[in-house]
């Protein structure tokens, strides 16, 4: 078998773990006559003409290169459908495309992650009538919209006043500036849930303004580790991108080598990172 893994590394600590999981799975498959090639865009933001060109060129290269299957950190493009129609088994990870463009998708359960975030804020915010905000990535990105939907659904059971859902397009500078504007416009803000890896700008804005509020973030990096340890960030919700890469490639192999069925969406269970269990992550 000849397999390909396609990734982007705009947030190296996040995307690198996905690629590491896929590489570890690829090493485990070496004894099964399986070749795995890895393609990654390492030149910055993923919402640029350059990254779009890389995606299209790489998908064409895979289509013309005799590959049997692809596991991709996906962004919507009709080329995924063309790839599948040409006989390549397409699977996506982290972010999905239209279901008819791929065979299965692996991700963490964003809806449940959003519900967890809302419940944590409800438990920890002493003045619950205060408004809360969600710092999201992209309005039309499925994993981001799923977390927002989960948060909104949970507030029907643990009532919170959602004052704002604002978007930063996975750009740390936009996250910082938009959070500064939010804090200035809403002096009573009680909490922010950051539903993407892009938390550094939000954290910087809150630090600079000296505001006391509940911060719940997503995933883990060196900055978040120290923020959780100090209590500045109350908790982070882990989507285990390493396991998405590892399990995603193994599932792709099993589907092709053994004709094993894979459910349409493979869900990874979100985990809560607190100061008390931080050493486990």
Regions found by a protein language model. Give the residues of each.
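Hydrophobic alpha-helical
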Residues: 55-57, 65-85, 151, 167-225
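Hydrophobic alpha-helical segments within soluble ligand-binding/sensing domains
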Residues: 105-131, 175-176, 224, 239-257
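Amphipathic helical "hinge" segments at domain boundaries
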Residues: 1-53
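Hinge/cleft segment of the Venus flytrap/periplasmic-binding protein
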Residues: 139, 153-155, 240-281
């Amino acid at each position: 078998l000849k397999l390909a893994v396609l990734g982007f590394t705009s947030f190296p600590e996040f995307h690198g773990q996905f690629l590491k999981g896929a590489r570890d799975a690829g090493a485990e498959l070496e004894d099964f006559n399986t070749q795995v090639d890895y393609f990654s865009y390492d030149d910055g933001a993923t919402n640029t003409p350059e990254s779009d060109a890389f995606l299209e060129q790489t998908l064409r290269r895979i289509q013309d290169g005799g590959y049997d299957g692809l596991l991709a950190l996906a962004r919507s493009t009709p080329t995924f459908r063309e790839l599948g129609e040409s006989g390549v088994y397409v699977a996506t990870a982290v972010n999905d495309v239209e279901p008819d463009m791929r065979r299965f998708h692996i991700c963490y359960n964003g809806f449940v992650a959003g519900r967890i975030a809302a419940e944590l804020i409800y438990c920890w915010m002493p003045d619950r009538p205060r408004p809360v905000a969600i710092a999201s990535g992209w309005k039309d990105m499925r994993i981001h919209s799923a977390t927002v939907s989960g948060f909104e659904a949970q507030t029907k059971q643990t009532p919170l006043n959602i004052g704002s859902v604002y978007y930063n397009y996975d750009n740390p500078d936009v996250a910082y500036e938009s959070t500064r504007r939010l804090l200035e416009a809403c002096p009573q803000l009680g909490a922010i849930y950051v539903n993407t890896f892009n938390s550094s700008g939000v954290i910087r804005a809150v630090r600079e303004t000296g505001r006391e509020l509940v911060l719940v973030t997503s995933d883990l990096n060196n900055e978040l580790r120290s923020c959780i340890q100090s209590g500045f960030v109350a908790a982070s919700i882990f989507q285990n991108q390493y396991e998405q890469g590892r399990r995603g490639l193994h599932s792709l192999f099993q589907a092709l080598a053994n004709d094993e069925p894979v459910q349409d969406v493979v869900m990874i269970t979100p985990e809560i990172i607190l100061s008390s269990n931080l050493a486990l992550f």
